[in-house]
Amino acid sequence: MNTLLTHGYFLREDPKEQLIMKPYPPLGLLCLSAWLDKHGVENEVFDTTFSSKEDLHQYLLEHRPRILALYTNLMTKINVIGIMRFVRSRVELRHCLIVLGGPDVTHNLEGYLAAGADLIAIGEGEQTMLEIALTVDGKRWTGDGGENRDDLILTSMSHITGIAFRLPDGTVFKTAPREKLRDIDRLPFPNRHKIDLHQYLDAWKRAHGHSAVSISTQRGCPYTCRWCSTAVYGQSYRRRSPEHVVDEIVHLQQHYDFDLIWFVDDVFTISHKWLGAFRDELQKRQVDIRFECITRADRMNRDVISILKDCGCFRVWIGAESGSQQIIDAMDRRVDVAQVRAMIQSTRRAGMQAGTFIMLGYPGETERDILETTRHLREADPDLFTITVAYPIKGTGLYDQVEAQMASTALPPWSEHTDRDIDFPRTYPRRYYDYAVRWTVNSVHWHKTQNTGRRLSVAGLKFLVKIWVARAGMVWWRVKGAYRSGSSKFILKPIR
């Protein structure tokens, strides 16, 4: 085998996702595979989602690929490192060239190269991976796993842009940046036929009674939110034509039985002109779909909501991250919280579901900001919302902001933790925010029971108990944090 594409996500190791059970296939790998196929490069995809580490190890030993390409993100870092260690430990795989790509590698070059990677593809990977594969296929690479491995990489791979590798003296070398693909209509449809997509559809069907597929229509995001990583596609905006996207939808409808589409784009309604053309193309070709997407409140209005509904949208996720304008501004979100509420409400009035995202524990956030966020959720009244506690991803503005403060945080070795494990000094201790999340969630749900006339129901009383318990936890950790810091500035005020 020439090239094997895989990743390190195993559903059986993710108890949260097992409860949610909304898995999607690795589109990035499937796009790489399709690009390689288009240019005549033999490749296979081993999808780990429904598999096991043992299955992957056995596959590697049986097929002995010349190139092992691993997609790497924050969630899969530890497993990817484990896969590399397995390859390096087996003499049968000594010729295997390990290539990493994905959002977590760009700002962690030294760590991944030290952990066993031969090459790292920085940014978009299609053309980079093609050139690596052609180099190996042309026998310019004869890696033997010996002491001269770094010399071989230097002499055979240094002509390829957009990669990083170690020089013989151990230092990390980056070639010139890879130019981004401007016309992404040139990309073939993802190679979904190389994995068992029915496993995903069946998992959805068993858990929810319907199934879903994912589609990407754009690359890059022009916004500068300080907590968000743009490590792969950068701060750009490139869009497939509406015709090309509808072609893919029709192709999927012809080959698979699914109910919903999840558009994975960061801001689906960023271009109103594109959105209108997309609707026209769907209607012209009489293509019926139901889908959900993500967007920003400032890229929505009544006309956009109407077009989304015409297209078949049933749910819109509208980013906010906070109900406090002060925190939104600190995040560089460049959106007005009142506009977020208005768009959530307008979306629901139009007959679609509205979801939103919230982040607690951002630098500078106080209990007053958390209260404003909870009030925001009560007033906006989205159908769905998710809450996370802020963590710094390397390469983001948030990471740069708190990096100096992270130095004193005790962490395991780099290869044994992810950015999610990193903490930094906040207004309150880290445990405080776990209770703040519970308080916010249950407060909003209790408010919904009031609006539906179930204030004294069993469900409403359960929410009240959870609110009191969460509030007690917030008070405890707030007082404990103030005591540890020697501060006397903690006044216990009720939250209403």
Where are the language model's segments positioned?
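Flexible glycine/acidic-rich beta-alpha junction loops that bind and position SAM and/or redox cofactors
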Residues: 12-14, 223, 273, 326, ...
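Short helix-capping segments at alpha-helix termini
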Residues: 40, 89-95, 283-288, 349-352, ...
